[in-house]
Amino acid sequence: MGHSRRPAGGEKKSRGFGRSKAVADVGDGRQTGGKPQVKKATFESTKKKEIGVSDLTLLSKISNEAINDNLKLRFEHDEIYTYIGHVLVSVNPFRDLGIYTDNVLQSYRGKNRLEVPPHVFAVAESAYYNMKSYKDNQCVIISGESGAGKTEAAKRIMQYIASVSGGTDSSIQHTKDMVLATNPLLESFGNAKTLRNNNSSRFGKYLELEFNTNGEPVGANITNYLLEKSRVVGQITNERNFHIFYQFTKAAPQKYRDLFGIQQPQSYLYTSRSKCFDVPGVDDSAEFRDTLNAMNVIGMTEGEQDEVFRMLAAILWIGNVQFAEDDSGNAVITDQSVVDYVAYLLEVDAAQVNKAFTIRVMETARGGRRGSVYEVPLNTVQALAVRDALAKAIYFNLFDWIVQRVNASLTARGEVANSIGILDIYGFEIFEKNSFEQLCINYVNEKLQQIFIQLTLKAEQDEYAREQIQWTPIKYFDNKVVCSLIEDKRPPGVFAALNDACATAHADSSAADNTFVGRLNFLSQNPNFENRQGQFIIKHYAGDVSYAVAGMTDKNKDQLLKDLLNLVGTSGNQFVHTLFPEQVNQDDKRRPPTASDKIKASANDLVATLMKAQPSYIRTIKPNDNKAPREYNVGNVLHQIKYLGLQENVRIRRAGFAYRQTFDKFVERFYLLSPKTSYAGDYTWTGDAESGARQILKDTSIPAEEYQMGITKVFVKTPETLFALEAMRDRYWHNMAIRIQRAWRNYLRYRTECAIRIQRFWRRTTGGLEFIKLRDQGHQLLNGRKERRRMSLLGSRRFLGDYIGVGNKGGPGEMVRNGAGISGSEEILFSCRGEVLVSKFGRSSKPAPRILALTNRHVYIIAQNLVNNQLVISSERTIPIGAIKAVGASNLKDDWFSIVVGSPQEPDPLVNCVFKTEFFTHLNNALRGQLNLKIADHIEYNKKPGKLATVKVVKDPAVARDDSYKSGTIHTGPGEPANSVSKPTPRPKQVSARPVTKGKLLRPGGPGGGPSKLAARPTPAAQPLPRATPQPAEPQPAARAVPQPVAAVAASHTRTGSTASVRAPPPPPPAAAPAPKKPTAKVLYDFNSQQSNELSIKAGEIVQIVSKEGNGWWLCMNMTTSAQGWTPEAYLEEQVAPTPKPAPPPPPAAPRSTPAPATNGAAAAAKAKPAPPAPPAKRPNMAARKAVPTPPPAPRDSAVSMNSHDSSGGSGRGTPNSMSNASLAGGLAEALRARQHAMQGKQDDDDDW
């Protein structure tokens, strides 16, 4: 009965876990299977704070007033939906709350009702997945009075199902579009503005969505009921005709205005009688465009649309036909031009229209033979009735044709497996004057209420009694007696009396009404009926309704005069014949079916259809009669709560069972949950279905009070228990899938590891070939003309190029690039740190650190300077590579070279770079092999513009490592022969083979499964760690570390010679230091806590001190109960921890040469107090550092890593660890100052002056 059961396919795994959360949330704390309470915290954290109760079955007091108060509280907080079990109660908010967006819709997809707040989407989700999982037809019955929101609920259900039903095929999507397009189309022709609702459905609609076996929509069918055709010809003040008339007259295109003479709605009687032309917040022109679009989606051709609008125009012009009395009192038409236009629209003869409106043809018959024919003139009242009858007949038949046309387009395009029906029919109506239309509407609502009673109340109790289930019976009101009062033939009901009156006195309307009143006297004995003068009262489930007798018989006849049928039969328009297909049988004397006969048959057919499906219910409530948002009329809502029977529904829900299923289907659904009924997914139980169901419930640990076993069914009390079973079933398949996934992932991991090993081997074999080729090009470029450095010939040496990372995004290299202004379009070929010879006024030239960068366009010499103690990076010199005339270098192993430009404004740079050969190679490639590399025993360059200078290069064996520049001479040590080439690449270190995978499903060692070397290697024995020398430390307030004896420490560091004949036994290890004790305090006085965060203590107790505060309170813990709280400091006396005993002395060692024991032995250490910690070292004096002798120069930094530097001295080429660090400038300042100190020890030369 609308249960949110889990589908067999398990589309959403999260649904099962959600049920676990529900069990933990609502259950009584017992373990109901597996791990249902694991997700409790997650579930609570995702739910927003609940207003009132979301399910009325959770009310502590069950009464109509309590239900009303809860609905009012939730309504005031914009929570319009509330559950009664699986029945949804909806309160119309009369405004958009933003709760029907796609995001909200997706949040309900695949969720049971307890995982998410109450919503109409949850009802749609339950119906759809129950249909898909259990192959049961579903229906959603939406009930409530007019204006309560039934139509909106039906549209939202269609919106949800269209969204989640899947199917990417174009035909399926087209079916969805057509189903959704039926809403604006049928609303425009079937809805109207009433006093209580701006978009009131004036017809009943049962939409049946048809699905294939995959749950994809393949078609639909619409059945319409009770179109209020009387609204076409008249409305009360402030109401409107059907929407389509105002849409058409306001927004009709010029084509229709020319063809059909369409004017504004004020020009027509049928649209202006009520003096209401507009609806607040509704744009009729925009609605008309939606209607035309819906017609196109449905597949109506342009010709069909033209005929529909022709009929609408004909109805409007028929209403403008007016009559007057002639001298004889007969009706005559006042404006013949209107009749002529009506005849043009209907394509009939105008004279025939005149005759049909003003004359009635009567025929007498005698003895079964045709008699005389008479033409009886009509008076004005009769003529108006004939005119209106024609207009109503055209519109009624036109509406039926539209529904049939929609059904033809929605015909199933595949095999239909199941269906979901949505019933949207206007609700119970009570007006000041109620007539035949209200009687029919209220009769249908009585039938729907009877279904609800039968399926939710009576059927519930009957099934419990039939299955011998113990439960508490609930009294309820069965409205079957009211339905019998209206529809029964024996004894005759209201409809039977009405039909009898119409048949007896069919000629005179007033006589027929009087006859009807007489027939109603026979119903006076019925307790639900009262007959009064000119009216009668029926006691409906929604309240007592008084119906006026006047005019009921005429409305019940529902017959179109044969004269009008003959008129439309002469039409030359084929569409008119389609609307009126029946032929007039002049000899048929049988009484045609009346309106009450038709509505009775339709209602019974509807009931039969609904009884074949599993229903879900939405009970809509109208909070006020003013259509005002945020207004809640307590009295009106309380009345609706009573007649909807919500209190009885809550009571029976609380007393009954949420789920029931036959034994065989229950076992079929859940046999996987018991190891005794299944193995590897196969059903293995050999007993009957009942015993199998019991075994499943036993193995899933369902408490006995949560279910009962009936005669043929198992009954589960709460939905949470069912959710737990479904969650376990989902986890079963989930676990099976995990096993398959684990094996597949293990194989993929194995395959990936194999590929990685092959790639690693290939990269190891061929990796770096490009850089090795560049290195070989460097050998060719030097061509045996220059001695080589030993490090340059290493086999692992590669020409990597951009050592500083100037071409990288992010990091220090990007800072250098941005500071130097290197364009992003330039490709970085080479970057490295080096030195440039800098000339200063009055001083000798000195090397200064710089960054050398080479791109495909320029050579950049980049400087790093301190400005206002901030590091500033800038390009000191930018040289286009095309302007380089030559590069000069010596034939020794030094790293100096000149870049000869010959600029008239700037000197040529003389550069010192450890990767000079790599620079030459990249520059030669950038110049496409046109580099002029001059190698000699000296280096030439323009020291000043136009002034050629020569730098001598001298081989000095005294230079151990790096070359040095002084007074125009470079001193360098001997190098490798000039014809030397790089050594072969060294072989990598051999490592043991690793298993391809460590998984349990595949054997280690590779595809063959052989043992790996790693697995065969024995595990090394654990070696004891040497004891560290004790370091002075701060004394701890709780406990002190036990000092080791000096002899033991000395013995642990004594190295025994290999020639010793006897090894003394090692001393025993010292005793382990006891764990530090927590500080404790003794309670001096009793203290009783006054607040929840305070701790009560008694004098003499020992408590543990957790923390101390400076405000006179200590946080303490009772060592017996572990309770914590705040206690006053004055009530406590802190206990001093005793000094631990020293370790026992070691046994005497054998007589051998061992160090003498120190004076501070173990006993002295035990007695000595711990020394206070040494004060922190003072900050070094920078002035004193200048007097320190210059340390030997450190190896030059090649800038391979940005993190290598020495701030204490050296060549000063180092840079800070990170250019993004805040101390970068300070570190660089230290480096620059260190270089200045180093240079002070060198003698200045006067080579510049």
From Swiss-Prot:
InterPro entries, per the entry: Fungal_myosin-I_SH3 (IPR035535), Kinesin_motor_dom_sf (IPR036961), Myo1_CA (IPR054489), Myosin_head_motor_dom-like (IPR001609), Myosin_TH1 (IPR010926), MYSc_Myo1 (IPR036072), P-loop_NTPase (IPR027417), SH3-like_dom_sf (IPR036028)
Domain Myosin motor residues, every copy: 51-730
Alphabetized SUPFAM superfamilies for the sequence: P-loop containing nucleoside triphosphate hydrolases (SSF52540), SH3-domain (SSF50044)
PTM annotation: Phosphorylation of the TEDS site (Ser-372) is required for the polarization of the actin cytoskeleton. Phosphorylation probably activates the myosin-I ATPase activity.
Boundaries of every SH3 domain copy: 1076-1137
Residue numbers bearing the Phosphoserine modification: S372
Residue ranges constituting the TH1 domain according to the UniProt record: 788-978
Organism superkingdom: Eukaryota
Residue ranges, compositional bias (Polar residues): 1200-1221
Single GO MF descriptor: microfilament motor activity
Chain residue ranges for the region called Actin-binding: 419-501
GO cellular component entries: actin cortical patch; actin cytoskeleton; cell tip; cytoplasm; myosin complex; plasma membrane
Binding sites annotated in the UniProt record for ATP: G144, E145, S146, G147, A148, G149, K150, T151
Ranges for domain IQ: 734-754, 755-780
Stated family: Belongs to the TRAFAC class myosin-kinesin ATPase superfamily. Myosin family.
Functional summary from the UniProt entry: Type-I myosin implicated in the organization of the actin cytoskeleton. Required for proper actin cytoskeleton polarization. At the cell cortex, assembles in patch-like structures together with proteins from the actin-polymerizing machinery and promotes actin assembly. Functions as actin nucleation-promoting factor (NPF) for the Arp2/3 complex. Plays an important role in polarized growth, spore germination, hyphal morphogenesis, and septal wall formation.
Record comment regarding domains: The myosin motor domain displays actin-stimulated ATPase activity and generates a mechanochemical force. The tail domain participates in molecular interactions that specify the role of the motor domain. It is composed of several tail homology (TH) domains, namely a putative phospholipid-binding myosin tail domain (also named TH1), an Ala- and Pro-rich domain (TH2), followed by an SH3 domain and a C-terminal acidic domain (TH3).
Protein name: Myosin-1
Taxonomic lineage: Eukaryota, Fungi, Dikarya, Ascomycota, Pezizomycotina
Gene: myoA
